[in-house]
Amino acid sequence: LGLAIGPLSWPQKNLSQASDKLPDADSVYSGSYSKAQIQDLISYANLHQITIIPEIDIPGHSRALMKALPDSFHEAGDNSEYAGYGNNSIPVCEFNSDSALGQKFTADLTNILTQTAQLFNQQTTLYAVNNELSIGGDEVFKGTWDDAPSCQTAPWNKMTSLQKEHYFLDTLNNNPPINQLKLSGWHEFVLTHDGQINSKHSIKPNETGHVWVWGKSSEVQSKAVTLANNDYPVILEYADYSYFDMTYTPQLKEPGFYWASKLGDTDASLSIAIAATNTQHQSNKPDNIIGLEGALWTDVIPDYTQLQYMALPKLAGLAEASWSAESVTDIGGKPNWQSLSYRLGCGKEGFLAYLNSVYQANYRGYPNGIEQEAPMLCNTANSVNP
């Protein structure tokens, strides 16, 4: 969920947003959350044991920062091209430099990160980490900063793009007052391309809030194991199971993506329980794998109705995988779908019927809701027992 935050030191620089459709080149966006509104969100979250982890995406995925404060976050002479585009990554080689850009970049980045973390510090939930801030850290592509003037001298000119990221983040993390924060991010912010810890410049486990492991489970499970074995607090976010923007079916009119899986349904989100168990069994320190997470990227969700449709009932499958015992979710190494489906959809008695009656949620059965699909014979002899 992206929020434009107003009460930082640059209220006049808030990015705009004003379209209830998918953004395009002509979209205009506006508005921001005040400090009071953010405190209201935190109070509500505390009451319901929901932890909010703020995020400022760096050093890649930073186009919003670069557009809002170009004098601080854009190096004019950097014509690097990467992943088919440029203008997406902040000038990391200028951090702590004496140049005019370096001084503005260092000061403004430090203030933005610190003030954002402080805004969300009043959390009292079970899993809240004081001073935690996610910096993302993912998808810094080959070629990033290759043509940046500030990166043409030592030590930067001998580094790959990912090495530059790690060197920058390590320096940032040791820089007061950032060294008082707990930085979190995707696995790339501490791992090399071959899935190893960058021993020279990775942020240390005891200085890290969380590390999210994302991607197809078959490709990134070993990375989760490496992180856990090295004492990092690991969250599994396997895209083939818990990316809720994956399509339910491969039908032409079905919304969603299929790069990670051609079937991202509720059974898939339940199945992450099996993948998580396998990951823990491969680790020498399974207790460092501390949770599962689902993702729904709202930049491709045009309205709240479709958000409900993509998240529900997948979210129930993820909750079952996350919070139920292995004896409930696992039958012979396969997900216990029958148990979950019985409790999800039993006509007017199941969890989905409850959602429909209380929230009028627009979930599976788009656009008419689960009433079109819920089994009406749950309490007969033909029903499946949990």
Where are these regions (language model features)?
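Anion (oxyanion) recognition and catalysis
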Residues: Q39, N46, N173, P177, ...
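An acidic- and aromatic-residue-enriched active-site/binding cleft used to recognize and process polar
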Residues: G6, I50, E55-H61, G137-V140, ...
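Flexible glycine/acidic-rich beta-alpha junction loops that bind and position SAM and/or redox cofactors
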Residues: S62-R63, G143-T144, F244-M246
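Feature activates predominantly on carbohydrate-active enzymes
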Residues: L1-T110, T114-F120, Y127-N130
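Flexible, acidic glycine-rich loops studded with aromatic residues
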Residues: L183-P386
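Soluble non-cytosolic domains of exported or imported proteins
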Residues: S32, A36, A100-Q103, A107, ...
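Active-site neighborhood of glycoside hydrolase catalytic domains
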Residues: P70, E81, N87-T208, W214-T226
